[in-house]
Amino acid sequence: MDESYFGPKRIRGKRGRGAGSKSIVFGLFKRNGWVYTEIVPDARKRTLQRVIRGKVSLDSIIHSDGWRGYHGLVDMGYAKHYRVAHGSNEFANDISHINGIESFWAYAKLRLGKIKGIRKEMFYLHLKETEFRFNHRRDNVYKLLLKLLRERPI
């Protein structure tokens, strides 16, 4: 699991966490390669744990970076929680890495960066389309969409 910031490249002044006009996206990466994303109002512990509680089963082993918003997951009942310390230039260790979700962030930012001027109200739909395409990257999306339309006609 990880969070990422989406929005205009750089505006004078604020950068990184708390950059004014950026949208915060929280992402979960399952070991089978599937991603779930959700736009969150902030990256505080309470907000992130609400999403985690709703989407992650208690017997899961959690891998994250060292962001303080992830502290206390074992106390909530999760089996194990491994961290990598990005702040200390650690991106993988013997038991943990979050390269899967980092790969999705790179894919999403590259894909969404090609669309100039996404309105904030439409960002959610573009993000979910990107999530869908990433989750079905090995499938024939055309055939998959035809199948979905046959099952649930408009």
Predicted regions located by residue number:
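Residue-level recognition of single "structural anchor" positions
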Residues: M1-I154
